[in-house]
Amino acid sequence: MSRLIHLSFVLALLACLTGPISANPIDDDRERLNQLLSNPEPADDAELLRNTQEAIALYKKHASRTLPGHQVELDLDRDIRAFETEHLTVDGLPIQGGVWDLIKRGADKVPDEVKDQAKELAKTTAKVLFNKLTEYLKKKISGEDAEKKDT
């Protein structure tokens, strides 16, 4: 009886291990990048922010594989830090309460024209960063895939 139980556990483990787990994370990242690129004009600001944050996550995953000090990576790192400071989120939602409430109250006194210009600037910044990141990732992911095939 114990052999039967042992065999069933081994079979269950094998079934779990051979399930739909991707063996090549670079292919998964390439697929996610293609999904992001398939929608160049997001429907709304939230989708643009979400896509940019996903591109940043992909960048952080792949940029760590290069030697430090490349100018392209340094520029992207600086742009990402600036973007993340301007778009602070917790679990994908904007921060609420605290100092931000004071800032929001002060923002109520700002003319609508200035708010609209700031919003457009933020969207433009996000789009530029998104485009830079996706171009970098296309080259980076393709390069890693070519290196793997050579070895």
From Swiss-Prot:
InterPro entries linked to this entry: Turandot (IPR010825)
GO BP annotation list: cellular response to heat; innate immune response; response to bacterium; response to heat; response to oxidative stress; response to UV
Listed Pfam families: Turandot
Keywords recorded for this protein, A-Z: Immunity, Innate immunity, Secreted, Signal
Cleavable signal peptide: 1-23
Superkingdom of origin organism: Eukaryota
Nucleus is among the record's keywords: no
Compartment(s) where it occurs, according to its Swiss-Prot or TrEMBL record: Secreted
UniProt GO cellular component terms: extracellular space
Family to which this protein belongs: Belongs to the Turandot family.
Function: A humoral factor that may play a role in stress tolerance.
Protein name: Protein Turandot Z
Organism: Drosophila pseudoobscura pseudoobscura (Fruit fly)
